[in-house]
């Protein structure tokens, strides 16, 4: 079965398009045009990587369709998966269930990663024998109940027989662990992880394509250093709501469908726990990036909160985006401000200006979007299509690409004219 996936509007952007010295260069998967803005964004990326940008704010300003979000996506791609990047819109803070500042606080803590280093006792080896003993369930005739489990693990040095708790059967069954698999069992938590198939069974006939791994060396019981990466918000949620499988926990989740609001006291407990790991040298903080699009949708209360956050020592880099000039500040009784932002917050922000794309840049953007979505078009149709981006808008043209794909094959001028007549620009 072929899996289909939606193509995101900025899926063609995979980098900022900078060389090793930070100068803008043309790349087939980079942000198009906007050389000065790309160079400025490269400096932001470098400062985030070296943890010198924490607790600072940047505003990307420019007209509609000029590439503000594309620039933010380029920053995210340059930072990579190791640095958290959270994206939200200014209108997302308004809710009947949760306070505006709570939504912002949650997004901020999603953007801060904690890498915790922990020493764990683990059993690791190849499964030589797996024996499951079941018994009749006294409450019903079906299904049978797991009474006990035994497993023999082998390394290059020794073998060891282990007795496992019946509650671990679900993990074994879910991962389809059988003889010949190399597994990893944590002593304290009871987590079982299948690492792969032993290389000793590479020549066996098997319908499933397994990953083959060497037989572990040394003793079966060993102490390993495990790195775990979680955000502060993940730690908050783990402490805020029960995650057990008992009946009381399930009933609590059914009766509490509302979004859980995390208290300041709980966040303080999480911060103290993380600080303890930091003082012992068992953890490190990785400040990430929070991107807030349409920042002019926030109100005075949100701006005051963000102003305080920027001054705090534990804060990610905040990137705003706005297409407004002088605009009313929400919640201020009609007071005007640049980009709809209060002056106190604006004084602490550095601004990256994005200009309207020239026709040649629009032509290249449309070409890449067509390639990304697999649309073919003859030269006359392409010239006419690019002309629509000038007479109407670039966003309008990009929104027509999925519609033109319904014609199949190579799209002609007549096809473009038909779609343009049916669907109008705002």
From Swiss-Prot:
Pfam entry (one): TIP49_C
Subcellular location: Nucleus
Transmembrane segments: none
Binding locations of ATP: 62-69
Domain of life from the UniProt record: Eukaryota
InterPro entries the UniProt entry points to: AAA+_ATPase, NA-bd_OB-fold, P-loop_NTPase, RuvB-like, RuvB-like_C, RuvBL1/2_DNA/RNA_bd_dom, TIP49_P-loop
Reactions catalysed, as given in the entry: ATP + H2O = ADP + phosphate + H(+)
Enzyme class, first EC level, given as a word: hydrolase
Keyword Ion transport: no
Family statement drawn from the similarity comment of this UniProt entry: Belongs to the RuvB family.
Protein name (record): RuvB-like protein 1
Taxonomic source organism: Encephalitozoon cuniculi (strain GB-M1)
The gene coding this protein: RVB1
């Amino acid at each position: 079965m072929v899996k289909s996936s939606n193509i995101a509007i900025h899926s063609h952007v995979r980098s900022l398009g900078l060389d090793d010295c930070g100068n803008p260069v043309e790349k087939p998967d980079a942000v198009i045009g906007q050389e000065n803005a790309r160079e400025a964004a490269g400096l932001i990326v470098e400062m985030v990587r070296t943890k010198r940008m924490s607790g600072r704010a940047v505003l990307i300003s420019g007209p509609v369709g000029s590439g503000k979000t594309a620039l933010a996506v380029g920053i995210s791609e340059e930072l990579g998966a190791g640095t958290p990047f959270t994206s939200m819109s200014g209108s997302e803070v308004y809710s009947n269930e949760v306070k505006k500042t709570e939504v912002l606080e949650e997004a901020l803590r999603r953007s801060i990663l904690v890498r915790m280093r922990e020493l764990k006792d683990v059993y690791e080896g190849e499964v030589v024998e797996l024996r499951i003993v079941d018994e009749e369930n006294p409450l019903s005739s079906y299904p049978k109940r797991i009474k006990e489990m035994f497993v023999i693990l082998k390394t290059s040095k020794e073998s060891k027989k282990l007795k496992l708790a019946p509650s671990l059967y679900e993990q074994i069954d879910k991962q389809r662990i059988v003889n010949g698999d190399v597994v990893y069992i944590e002593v304290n938590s009871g987590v079982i992880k299948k690492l792969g198939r032993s290389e000793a069974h590479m020549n066996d006939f098997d319908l499933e394509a397994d990953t083959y791994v060497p037989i572990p060396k040394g003793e079966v019981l060993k102490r390993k250093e495990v790195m775990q990466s979680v955000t502060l918000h993940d730690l908050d949620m783990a402490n805020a709501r029960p995650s057990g499988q008992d009946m009381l926990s399930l009933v609590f989740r059914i009766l509490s469908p509302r979004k859980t609001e995390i208290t300041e006291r709980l966040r303080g407990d999480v911060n103290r726990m993380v600080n303890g790991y930091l003082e012992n040298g068992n953890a490190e903080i990785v400040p990430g990036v929070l991107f807030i699009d349409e920042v002019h949708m926030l109100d005075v209360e949100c701006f005051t909160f963000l102003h305080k956050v920027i001054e705090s020592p534990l804060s990610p880099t905040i990137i705003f985006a706005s297409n407004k000039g002088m605009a009313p500040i929400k919640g201020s009784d009609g007071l005007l401000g640049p980009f709809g932002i209060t002056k106190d917050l604006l004084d602490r922000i550095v601004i990256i200006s994005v200009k309207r794309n020239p026709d040649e840049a629009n032509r290249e953007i449309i070409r890449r979007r067509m390639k990304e979505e697999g649309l073919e078009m003859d030269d006359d149709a392409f010239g006419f299509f690019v002309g629509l981006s000038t007479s109407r808008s670039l966003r309008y043209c990009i929104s027509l690409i999925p519609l033109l794909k319904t014609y199949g094959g190579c799209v002609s001028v007549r096809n473009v004219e038909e779609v343009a007549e049916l669907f109008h620009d705002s």
